[in-house]
Structures are given as structure tokens and as C-alpha cells.
Design a protein with these regions (language model features):
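Short, structured coil segments at secondary-structure junctions
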Residues: 65-68, 76, 172-176, 229-230, ...
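Short, acidic loop-to-helix structural element flanking the phosphoryl-transfer center
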Residues: 27-45, 89-96, 105, 137-139, ...
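Conserved acidic, metal-coordinating active-site core of Asp-based
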Residues: 103, 107-226, 238
Length: 271
């Protein structure tokens, strides 16, 4: 579903991924230099978040309030908001979802599912438990029957497992993109009808802004298409090598003032 409302003479777009682009996972904070850069950009640019998160969820809303973006490409392009208005949304095909759940259920080494309404609907929850405990020291999820997912409104799914398994899933289901996370221990599973890049295109259409007047920052493979599509695509210094190769420019890492340094390099702000 898409709402069309063209606005003229809007400011150029600067788009940011959240995790390990703005938000440093080492201490779960946004560096001061990045926050200062966002504040300087605000006067002359439209600030967009393009993320695999649902920024309206209780898990992410504090970050949204801290960053104060003009628009958000949520859940890898399956939901787009401008202010509090949803201008586009796409729900995962239910029959395809059933097929993916059945496929993953036969592989005990991986897990696939989604989190909806405070519950986590995953096959092989022990895989998710181990993944979360290894990364964060604990797993606080509330697991539920994954076969209930097709009865719910789901926009994207998540894969927990290694890169080989993610590639196999992508080959088995050509209708989806399986984009590995930066740590290569999991991936977003998104229907090809939606992506961060398509979200950027839809926002350009909404605001009547040419793609050439956009800048996109990212660090992982779910940023690949938006970095390639934007007028200027920027990979963080901590980004995956494939993304660095695709980018127009590689800046410093998230914890080394990468956001600020790239914005200064391209003349978006002055020190």
C-alpha cells in the first residue's frame, strides 16, 4: 500500500543505517561527533533512517526520539514513515512464509522467524538462544509457535545461522533477499518487492527529490542496494568488504568519527 503526496523544493536526503553506522555496538551509544553532525545537517538536509529495525517498536523508539529523523525506511523498506504518517507498507506473502518455515524446520543448524507483538516466533529457538547469549550474554526472548506467524502481519523475517546456510536459503527461495548481518551470524529475509533502495526511491518520489541529491551511509549487506542507488554511497570503515567495494567512498569506522568525517569530506557540513 502506498500513499502518494508530492512535496516540492524539499531538501536533499542524507540517509543513515542505524546499527554500527550511527549506533556503536561496543557501548550501544551514538558517538557525540555523529550526534553533532546530525544537528548540523538538520537545517539544510532531510535526515532519513534506513534500517532493518522497526523504529516504532519499544526496542527502538528511544533511538528514534534521540535522532529525530524526518523520515524512516523501516524493516528494510517494508514500511516507510514521514513523521507519524505511514506512506508505504508491504506484508510478507503468507504462503511463501509457510514454505520458508518448513524449509528451516528441516535444518537444525539454523533458525528462521520473526518477532511480533512482544513474542518471538522462531523454529529451533535453541539456535536463537545460543546466538543471543554469545553476542549479549543473555537471551530474554519470549518464544512462541512459529507456525502462528502466517496468521500475523509480518513484514520481514530473520535468519540465524552461518553464511553458507543463508546463501542456500536465497538459492532455494529466489523471491527473497537474504542479506547477512555484519557479524555474519544471521541475516534479514526480505521479499524482493521491498528494499532500502526502493524505500529511498519512494521517498524521493514523495518529496520530489532526484536520486542524485541523496547520500546513503551503511555497513552491512542490507545496505548494499541503497549505497549503490544513492547519489553518493558511503561505507563505514567497519563495513563488510563487499559493501566497501560497492561504495563511492569509504569513511572511518563508527567509533572513529566516520559520520562526521565523511560529511566534512563531501562538504555537507563545515567544522
Amino acid at each position: 500500500m502506498e500513499k502518494r503526496q508530492v512535496r516540492k523544493n524539499m531538501k536533499p536526503i542524507v540517509s543513515f543505517d542505524v546499527d554500527m553506522t550511527l549506533l556503536d555496538h561496543k557501548d550501544w551509544t551514538i558517538p557525540d561527533s555523529a550526534m553533532e553532525t546530525l544537528q548540523r545537517l538538520r537545517e539544510n538536509y532531510t535526515i532519513v533512517l534506513a534500517t532493518g529495525r522497526d523504529m516504532d517498536s519499544s526496542f527502538s523508539v528511544v533511538l528514534k526520539e534521540q535522532i529525530r529523523p524526518d523520515a524512516i525506511i523501516h524493516l528494510n523498506g517494508t514500511k516507510i514513515t514521514v513523521g507519524d504518517t505511514i506512506i508505504y507498507e508491504h506484508l510478507f506473502d503468507k504462503e511463501l512464509m509457510r514454505q520458508i518455515i518448513a524449509y528451516a524446520q528441516d535444518d537444525a543448524a539454523c533458525s528462521v522467524g520473526a518477532s511480533v507483538g512482544g513474542y518471538d516466533y522462531y523454529v529451533h529457538p535453541e539456535v536463537v538462544n545460543r546466538h543471543d547469549t554469545d553476542l549479549w550474554g543473555e537471551c530474554g526472548r519470549r518464544f512462541a509457535d512459529p507456525w502462528k506467524l502466517p496468521d500475523l502481519d509480518v513484514r520481514t523475517m530473520a535468519y540465524i545461522g552461518d553464511e553458507k546456510g543463508a546463501k542456500a536459503m536465497g538459492a532455494r527461495f529466489p523471491e527473497v533477499n537474504v542479506h547477512m548481518f555484519a557479524e555474519k551470524r544471521g541475516a534479514d529475509v526480505v521479499e524482493k518487492t521491498a528494499s532500502k533502495a526502493m524505500g529511498l526511491i519512494r521517498l524521493c518520489d514523495y518529496f520530489n527529490i532526484p536520486l542524485s541529491s541523496t547520500v546513503a551511509f551503511g555497513d552491512s549487506m542490507n545496505d548494499y542496494d541503497i549505497v549503490k542507488t544513492a547519489g553518493i554511497g558511503i561505507a563505514m570503515g567497519n563495513a563488510m568488504e563487499e559493501l566497501k567495494e560497492a561504495a563511492d567512498y569509504v569513511t572511518d569506522a563508527v567509533d572513529s568519527d566516520g559520520i562526521r568525517n565523511a560529511c566534512v569530506h563531501f562538504g555537507l557540513i563545515r567544522l
